[in-house]
């Protein structure tokens, strides 16, 4: 990465001076830069033209980080691996002023590499799209624009001071680019005694304040502040909490439309659902029963809210805690909450040393679509784990005083989350249907390969750098308490050539995506290859796919097997999605952002089966329930976390005719876009009989 006058972080042990390139005068660099940018249709910068720039056409130039002395040789020809959509995503959100794509990748690699060789390999992995750092690392690695971590978990204590402390911490976290998951289950419910002379107002008014604070605070310069709130299934206010994001019904002053929410589900509750038993709602303070309700009625309420609004997220807390790291079990550290995307499961609150913890996790993801390219590279995953270790250290060194509890937690457990993207893309590239034993076999093989590599890397790093304090305290040789977590990867999957996000199936084979620079038509690249082979890659075919809600099931020239391979997310039986998620659960230290997709005509038993089987088969958490409807419904905040597959599908009777227009024009006029899936009404959802 080529940067001039990069600000130094005075608190950091890692200095961030500019990268320099020799061999060109300022005027020559300006001319080369202008020529190269014009080749890809970009305007040259209008300011700071005397700042040296890397010319795309000058391959194999060495870029040196003058502070660390580390040198990275960049290859501008690798820009060709980026799609137009990926380029626009980088330009809209992640490039610094005057920075090229390869310079960005080199900036991150050189800053977090151990030495020249490690930095070079990291650059090669990123630029070849084998893996991609999480977006805060891309945005902020090697500069003072923000922190390289944006994932935080905390909890509110049952006192006014505890509540205000949480608000204050969340303001600072959001202001510095943090996404927050907060646990509110410690607070007494509405009407319980306070000091023997008063009654509590419950959790909702305090969550409402957090809702307003979240809306007011921006995350860096890239996105609005975001937060999720979590409550256990036995809290006395759970019934109102489930409906807190529903925009209609109830007191509008007791709604929190700008927050996301999740529910911690216990095994005992699910057994009560199985047995059609009663369920006690208990005071968090003294465990006295405040109310008793039928377990199934509460379960139905949860499912109804998920189908109609997409939330709450579900976290099966006993499964999560049973699989937490051994050192956390020995220390009595409990996992009570999750994050914005339900894949981070780390302990919060007061630890065994009497200190408060705000959990922190730094993320990056390998690209499974490129699995055949990196599977036999013995350095690949160990290099990434060293990279993540340096990222977490960067946060520890540079976290401001307002994040002391987060820095403490990061120092004690050093949890990271290496995830994946491109699973469905890999299946499709290799002609493998999602629904089948071949997909199950590859799913296990790939995740077992990753698990073995990260486990060995953690142990090897513990020998070299020392075990993390939480593990060392009990004689356990682990550099990281947690090593893996599967995030949604909405943005970085776009950067990686349009790989399918996370472990999620592709939602449509053609759709439009809006960016700050315009609207892009996105076609399934693997399907396009198949259509080319069959001589069917033309606008007429793509428009017919568009008219069929992104589906290829109507294409007579495809075989049944090919139609199975290119089923969309909503066409896949979700029980297969749960099955694959369950198979890899024990190979992932934390959890996985797992959406389920529900067609508008789904029967009630199918909806129940999906969610019930997730618990029964040992899945740790469920993210959104993406439901389809013919008519758009209100679902709350316009600032919802979105992925590129969150599409609004066209009305059944709204067919798009070509009329001489290009496919891009047709897609732009259609309603296939990146909006949220609409909600479908299941107001009278009833639970089927459980055998």
Report the location of each language-model feature.
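Conserved, charged catalytic cores of large soluble enzymes
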Residues: 36, 48-116, 187, 191, ...
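Catalytic alpha/beta core of large soluble enzyme barrels
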Residues: 81, 341-350, 392-397, 484-646
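Function-dense linear segments that define catalytic or interfacial modules
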Residues: 96, 111-115, 123-147, 153-195, ...
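Generic beta-strand/beta-sheet core signal
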Residues: 154, 183-187, 231-234, 241, ...
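Conserved small/polar residues in nucleotide/adenosyl-binding loops
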Residues: 680-689
């Amino acid at each position: 990465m080529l940067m001039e006058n990069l600000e130094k972080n005075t608190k950091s042990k890692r200095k961030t001076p500019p990268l320099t390139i020799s061999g060109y005068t300022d005027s020559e660099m300006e001319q080369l830069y202008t020529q190269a940018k014009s080749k890809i249709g970009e305007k040259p910068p209008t300011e700071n033209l005397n700042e040296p720039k890397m010319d795309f056409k000058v391959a194999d130039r060495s870029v040196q980080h003058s502070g660390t002395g580390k040198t990275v040789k960049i290859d501008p020809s690798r820009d060709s691996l980026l799609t137009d959509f990926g380029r626009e995503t980088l330009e809209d959100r992640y490039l610094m002023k005057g920075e090229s794509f390869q310079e960005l990748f080199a900036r991150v690699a050189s800053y977090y590499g151990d030495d020249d060789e490690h930095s070079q390999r990291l650059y090669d992995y990123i630029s070849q799209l084998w893996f991609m750092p999480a977006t805060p690392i891309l945005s902020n690695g090697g500069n003072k624009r923000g922190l390289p971590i944006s994932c935080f978990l905390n909890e509110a204590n049952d006192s006014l001071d505890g509540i205000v402390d949480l608000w204050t911490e969340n303001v600072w976290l959001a202001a510095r680019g943090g996404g927050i998951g907060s646990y509110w289950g410690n607070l007494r419910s509405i009407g319980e005694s306070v000091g023997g002379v008063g009654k509590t107002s419950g959790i909702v008014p305090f969550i409402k304040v957090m809702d307003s604070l979240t809306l007011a605070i921006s995350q860096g310069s890239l996105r609005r502040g975001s937060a999720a709130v979590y409550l256990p299934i036995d809290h006395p206010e759970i019934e109102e909490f489930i409906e807190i994001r529903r925009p209609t019904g109830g007191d509008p002053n007791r709604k929190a439309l700008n927050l996301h929410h999740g529910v911690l589900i216990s095994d005992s509750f699910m057994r009560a659902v199985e047995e059609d038993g009663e369920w006690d709602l208990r005071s968090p303070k003294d465990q006295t029963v405040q109310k008793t309700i039928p377990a199934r009625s509460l379960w139905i309420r949860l499912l109804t809210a998920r189908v109609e609004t997409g939330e709450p997220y579900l976290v099966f807390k006993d499964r999560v805690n049973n699989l937490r790291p051994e050192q956390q079990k020995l220390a009595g550290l409990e996992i009570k909450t999750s994050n914005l995307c339900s894949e981070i499961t780390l302990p919060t609150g007061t630890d065994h040393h009497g200190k408060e913890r705000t959990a922190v996790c730094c993320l990056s993801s390998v690209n499974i679509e490129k699995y055949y390219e990196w599977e036999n590279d013995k350095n690949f995953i160990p290099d990434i784990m060293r990279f993540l270790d340096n990222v977490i250290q960067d946060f520890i060194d540079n976290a401001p005083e307002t994040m002391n509890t987060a820095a403490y937690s990061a120092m004690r457990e050093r949890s990271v989350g290496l995830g994946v993207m491109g699973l469905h893309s890999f299946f499709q590239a290799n002609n493998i249907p999602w629904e089948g034993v071949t997909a199950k076999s590859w799913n296990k093989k790939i995740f077992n390969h990753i698990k073995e590599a990260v486990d060995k890397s953690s142990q090897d790093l513990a020998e070299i750098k020392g075990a993390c304090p939480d593990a060392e305290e009990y004689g356990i040789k682990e550099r990281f308490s947690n090593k893996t977590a599967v995030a949604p990867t909405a943005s970085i999957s776009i950067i990686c050539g349009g790989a399918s996000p996370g472990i999620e199936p592709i939602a449509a084979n053609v759709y439009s995506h809006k960016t700050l620079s315009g609207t892009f038509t996105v076609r399934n690249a693997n399907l396009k290859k198949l259509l080319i082979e069959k001589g069917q890659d033309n606008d007429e075919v793509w428009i017919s796919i568009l008219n069929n809600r992104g589906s290829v099931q109507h294409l007579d020239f495809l075989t049944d097997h090919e139609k199975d391979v290119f089923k969309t997310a909503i066409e896949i039986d979700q029980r297969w999605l749960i099955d694959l998620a369950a198979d890899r659960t024990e190979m992932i230290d934390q959890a996985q952002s797992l959406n389920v997709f529900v067609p508008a005509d789904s029967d009630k038993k199918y909806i129940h089966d999906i969610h019930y089987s997730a618990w029964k088969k040992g899945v740790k958490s469920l993210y959104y329930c993406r439901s389809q409807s013919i008519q758009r419904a209100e679902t709350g905040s316009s600032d919802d976390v979105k992925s590129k597959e969150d599409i609004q599908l066209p009305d059944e009777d709204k067919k798009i005719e070509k009329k001489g227009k290009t496919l891009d024009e047709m897609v732009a006029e259609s309603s296939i876009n990146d909006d949220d899936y609409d909600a479908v009404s299941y107001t009278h959802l009833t639970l089927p009989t459980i055998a």
